[in-house]
Amino acid sequence: MQIRLKPDYSFFIASSSTMASTSSLGPSTLLSYGSPSRQFPDFGFRLISGHESVRIPSFRRFRVHCESKEKEVKPSSPFLESSSFSGDAALRSSEWKAVPDIWRSSAEKYGDRVALVDPYHDPPLKLTYKQLEQEILDFAEGLRVLGVKADEKIALFADNSCRWLVSDQGIMATGAVNVVRGSRSSVEELLQIYRHSESVAIVVDNPEFFNRIAESFTSKASLRFLILLWGEKSSLVTQGMQIPVYSYAEIINQGQESRAKLSASNDTRSYRNQFIDSDDTAAIMYTSGTTGNPKGVMLTHRNLLHQIKHLSKYVPAQAGDKFLSMLPSWHAYERASEYFIFTCGVEQMYTSIRYLKDDLKRYQPNYIVSVPLVYETLYSGIQKQISASSAGRKFLALTLIKVSMAYMEMKRIYEGMCLTKEQKPPMYIVAFVDWLWARVIAALLWPLHMLAKKLIYKKIHSSIGISKAGISGGGSLPIHVDKFFEAIGVILQNGYGLTETSPVVCARTLSCNVLGSAGHPMHGTEFKIVDPETNNVLPPGSKGIIKVRGPQVMKGYYKNPSTTKQVLNESGWFNTGDTGWIAPHHSKGRSRHCGGVIVLEGRAKDTIVLSTGENVEPLEIEEAAMRSRVIEQIVVIGQDRRRLGAIIIPNKEEAQRVDPETSKETLKSLVYQELRKWTSECSFQVGPVLIVDDPFTIDNGLMTPTMKIRRDMVVAKYKEEIDQLYS
């Protein structure tokens, strides 16, 4: 099955593997849904089979966002040709040709509004949109004075801060390419990225970080210069180092002086000596877990601008909204989010896991952009607070939450927002009775749900903020977490994408927030589900490999054409390596507004094949097990074994609360009981369990920067213990 967003505002589903004109369809069938309205009109649809066309009565459904394709762009003068020098008015979004063009528009619209709050650096900083634009201009000009040229690679190895954003955009504004990574990566990985990318210089967080990598980099890499974003140059270990070192302030001052001279001479020609094309590479982002075969994802300005221009459909941010940022700024998900929100005039605050709880209460953000693990942590924290209450309060809270979840379930049924794989819609009378029953039950539960909002949920909201929406990406959002936050009135919007797709390819909107799904395709984005063996396109509701095509798909892997060809074909289809399905379209029933949404099942490479030949998706079991407060982390194992096993990190604090006399043996027994309890309804059950003490973290290399567990590395670390477990 294939979904395609067409320029005539139509939404197509085709049964063939490639789209064809209606005059050449032959036996294939095409469904066309069309209306230019921006609300939720009655969509008529036309069945076209061969050369015949039949009009079928319209039915009510939600609109799928479809707009005309982006026009081809010509090479443009770079960002440094800004109104600051030429006196031009602010650029319209249609005129953006390179990512840094957005700052010219934002500075003009939101000049004195606060753009960034960076409270945990020394000194703490707060920048307005105008100040941010000027610092980017100064940094870019400072690099130009140092001799940085278009297409040269500059490594940016640093973590979240306002200076990270300034340097990131300053590098892009010169026409150079930034190569990004965080400071928590290993020295070996950073050196490999630097050398493979052919970077010529490096921008780092602070002296402590560079001192850690100095020996390897000075002896094995060629560095034209080094820039420190924070800290003093005097703290650097410079023995035997013959590299020019600049502080952030020196680059900014250098840029200011050069700009002042050019402004005084009325000569802007120096700012126009490079041209940035939309198809030029803007950044190279290396995929997590890079080892022997580097995969540097080349993202162009056009790739990133696609995200910036079209994410507003999913996140209708307004000037003055507060965003809390905690993911690595260099990661594709956070990066695209930041670029987008700064075109809306929002105020972004940087935080971290360490300060998240306090900052949610302190800043009361309208939005938070994060990964599923963070929402799971918030969920667990709320549950823990409820459990610590008196018996009466605990009973009342848990009862009302169950009532609210039942109410929302009924609401989803009568609104037609329940997922199904069934291709055949229900009979009209069955659909009507189902709808009527759900309306009646919802009406009965509504008073108790409103009571819960007043007595319980209001307090939860005051402690976490998130008054508009929590944006989730970078992994699968567990359905129990999804349902819980829906019940208490905190909207979670899930999306899906990869580094190779800049990253978002689909997402849930406020108007069509189908739980359990990743939403509809983004503007200009095509999806198809193919059989992993035959590569044939599968019909709606059938599980297979997800392939996507669109303007956000990468140019390719840097200096790695063979790997690029494995995932990206000549027609532009990118193999995501993920499994999933596309929800069928129904004109009636509880799934009538779910048609076309994407549902993820997991990574194809994560599928466990037992020695019996059975295929198991571990994610289903892991998500179910994580509902237990006794289980902190879990990895399901069993490749080529007769049965499944699991590696589990227990929550010892919670276990001791359940049983204060917990010993090693009783802990294992308790964990196993909890595992059986919460996974009893899963398709497969877990057999032997390995209890380990050390948690999986980013620092020990067992989690990615977006907090996903690296299964292969966990299995490799505990190989001997796993062998003993099965012996």
Curated annotation (Swiss-Prot):
Its EC number is 6.2.1.20. The keyword Plastid applies. It comes from the Eukaryota. Transmembrane segments: none annotated. It is found in: Plastid, Chloroplast. It catalyses: a long-chain fatty acid + holo-[ACP] + ATP = a long-chain fatty acyl-[ACP] + AMP + diphosphate. The keyword Nucleus does not apply. Its main location: plastid. Keywords: Chloroplast, Fatty acid metabolism, Ligase, Lipid metabolism, Plastid, Transit peptide. It is an enzyme of class 6 (ligase). GO terms for cellular component: chloroplast; chloroplast envelope; plastid. Residues 1-66 form a transit peptide. GO terms for biological process: fatty acid biosynthetic process; fatty acid elongation. GO terms for molecular function: long-chain fatty acid [acyl-carrier-protein] ligase activity. Belongs to the ATP-dependent AMP-binding enzyme family. Probably involved in the activation of fatty acids to acyl-carrier-protein prior to fatty acid elongation in plastids. Acts on medium- to long-chain fatty acids. This is Long-chain-fatty-acid--[acyl-carrier-protein] ligase AEE15, chloroplastic. It comes from Arabidopsis thaliana.
